[in-house]
Amino acid sequence: MAAKQIVFSRGARAAILKGVNTLADAVKVTLGPKGRNVVIEKSWGSPVVTKDGVTVAKEVELAGKLENMGAQMVREVASKTSDKAGDGTTTATVLAQAIFGEGLKLVEAGHNPMDLKRGIDAAVAKVIEAVQKAAKPTKDKDQIAQVATVSANGDKEIGQILADAMEKVGKEGVITVEENKRMTTELETVDGMQFDRGYLSPYFVTDPEKMTAVLTNPLILVHEKKISAMADLLPLLEQVVKQGRELLILSEDVEGEALATLVVNKLRGTIKVAAVKAPGFGDRRKDMLKDIAILTGATPFMEDLGQKLESATVRDLGTAKRVEIDKDNTVIVDGQGDKTAIKGRIEAIRKQIADTTSDYDREKLQERLAKLAGGVAVVKVGAATETEMKEKKARVEDALHATRAAVEEGIVVGGGVALFRAAASLESLKFNDERDVGVRLVRRAVEAPLRQIAQNAGVDGTVVAEKVRSGAPTFGYNAATDSYEDLLAGGVIDPAKVVRHAISNAASVAALMLTTEALVAEKPKKEKAAAGGAPGGMGGMGGMGGMGGMGGMGGMGDFDMG
């Protein structure tokens, strides 16, 4: 085991602060409509130009092990906010730096870090309550477009396209982002169904970079029970191979010999196939499998109907234009089922929704209806160069997450003003002990995003903060137009969910760092002096003989049986 270096109290916190500041200073320059770009070197290809906080944070790795610990903890703030809310990563980083930086001064001045933490936790809970109280539900398409525009760095074209997409497929619909071969950014909508089950084996992946499996015009087998014996599946597979088609298998599970054989033959190029677990449980799974069967025109193999898999033919399989599968989700695009049967199924589900008395059943039926009737919208992002394309695609993805968050929990005034105003809710929070110092710390820290937005726009943050303080609740500084106005009326709005997660995650990690008393890291290894002469080169190793191919079992046609 390598020797460790251990640093205590003041030295430990100073090392963390250095790492926090290095990462946060690189990230916070991207905040707001006048935020600057960060250029990131790649080991291959052209550098990445980005204004996305989490992209910058993920690339920062410091040479000093102790400082790097601080940087990685703030990186966790950005990543967690991105995972939970999809946006607000830069705001979260700015808040974490402000809370930790201010808190560290107080700890060094002799305040108890544990009492500070308790005060910070209580203050943040109050701020979140104020943000949620101020949130208003999204009224119309225009507000959704405004949220997307703000998140996409003021790009109105992206805002409008995402608002159109959400209008076409509904709030429950699926919206995906792809690269366009042309220079323009376009919206395509197609009928599709999404459910939360991914591929059963990563060996089914067709795009290793995105870790997705994409099947074009595949045949689709819908089977209720587990498939484990290859002998049951083989007659059908041989028919599929003869037709030269791709295959999607949907069943309770595919395991053992059956899964191993599918993987081997996929890797050998005998058949392009993917297996996915059926969505839902119990009777609900049966219903969803029937939905998928009707959508794709398949005959579902159900146990209670006495159908046997070994008697299946290609005529029993459904089909769709395209199927996209990642580790968690499957999207069936443009199922080729009978339109009249699909409409009949939709009407039957609507009738069940009207008749049911259970809220839980109603919710699940509405989910099924959305999956069957909802579509898939594809935003195709175009740009003049690959570098611009990647940067624009990242902005579209951010904006998409922001619009979903806005629909979920409503909107608040943007430009850092929602948190700035929430500070007023802390006036009534009094403990009459050391915790009050933590509350005052949060009051100052929540102003940091507004000040940083102003600073990035080339304006003095303190002057802007004082002017905003004297205005109405929705009055603030619009950095895009360099003017003071009613930001809500001007369309400068943020999703409440993003603001909530940003302050919550930032305070959580900052408080942890404030209560750190020791750091343990590996000691840097001393460089050994170079040897006098290089040893003679080793003789090349003889190549290993090629392994013979696996013989197919008799009567099994083209299939290798693992």
UniProtKB/Swiss-Prot annotation:
Transmembrane segments: none annotated. CDD domains: GroEL. One of its GO terms (molecular function) is unfolded protein binding. It is an enzyme of class 5 (isomerase). It catalyses: ATP + H2O + a folded polypeptide = ADP + phosphate + an unfolded polypeptide. InterPro entries: Chaperonin_Cpn60_CS, Cpn60/GroEL, Cpn60/GroEL/TCP-1, GroEL-like_apical_dom_sf, GROEL-like_equatorial_sf, TCP-1-like_intermed_sf. Keywords: ATP-binding, Chaperone, Cytoplasm, Isomerase, Nucleotide-binding. It comes from the Bacteria. Pfam families: Cpn60_TCP1. Its EC number is 5.6.1.7. Belongs to the chaperonin (HSP60) family. This is Chaperonin GroEL 1. The lineage of its organism: Bacteria, Pseudomonadati, Myxococcota, Polyangia, Polyangiales.
